Amino acid sequence: MKKFAPAAGFAVALMASMPWTASAQGAACGFRGSLDDAYCDENRDMVADVPREASRLRDPSTLVFAYTPVEDPALYASQFRPLLEYLTTCTGKRTVYFQVTSNAAQVEAMRSGRLHIAGFSTGPTAFAVNLAGAVPFAIKGGPESFESYRVVTIVRADSNIQTLADLKGRRVAHTSATSNSGNLAPRAFFPGLGLTPDTDYRVVYSGGHDRSVMGVNAGDYDAAPVASDVYNRMIGRGQVRRENFRVIWESDPFPTSSFALAHDLRPELAQRIRQCFYDYRFPEAMRRDLGGNDRFWPANYAEHWAPVRAVADAVNAPYNRAAFDAESRRELEAEQRRNQQRQQQQQAPAAAPAAPRVQ
């Protein structure tokens, strides 16, 4: 199956070369709420309306799908292959995987019309809705209900950190500025518990939940707030061992990643894709890789993402273009730093053999 791999910084470069302008629909729109000027929300359901003009509806011969890069993006190309093969048969349209390296790149890919279906992580879902015309329609889950997750703050099992108060003066990994569980929720909840990020402890952006978990495991960070579903999947795959960690705090549940459609797909095609998702049952390997989930449940953005928007409101982090541009720059800078670190690590053995690590 063909994969597309955009270069690091793709979102920032593309935004610089392609201004975001209001569409004809935007100019005639009576209400758009929090949506960008390119979209309209006259029915006030908080997501972009289907364009009124038939000429603006899309019916692509190939459907392009991407999943949020909360872990190594290459993992998902394999995990979602059965779904894409099924969608190819179910919709009658070839469906391919588009590998993205950042949340910003994924949002911009849908905004620019090159992405038709996407799984967005919890926080960036709101950016995708407001800025890219994404319409969430499904959440993965099990036989009883859709999946939720908690923010868990993890430390090494052998650490002397026992409570959030012990994080004062420490080095704590947050994932990225737009992440609900990896940044916004801790900033909303921790001050009420006597701990203020950036003031009481140093925030270091790791670039992803898996990187935060691995960094705590390696001793690079003293603690990290991460999404419980990612943490548990990493344990299930054997990437880390549960007994090497302790959870010192957890939140109430949040919805997990959304699956969304581009707002301007031909309505008959959009409905067909929705029904294909709802009818699908995950094969065994996919169930195992995705935490035991076996199906997709209908999602309603206005209802199910209300707790996420409340967290963003609490920390004055609006899901608008200014915030998105700032996060895009941060993601690019963080990726550049990680690339430099990798280059330094690759060059280090040539200068001097590394000392054996004492366990």
Regions found by a protein language model. Give the residues of each.
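Bacterial N-terminal signal peptides
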Residues: 9-17
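Short helix-initiation/N-cap motifs at beta->coil->alpha
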Residues: 97-108, 197-214, 253
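A ligand-binding cleft/hinge motif common to bilobed small-molecule-binding domains
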Residues: 122-132, 186-192, 215-218, 222-243
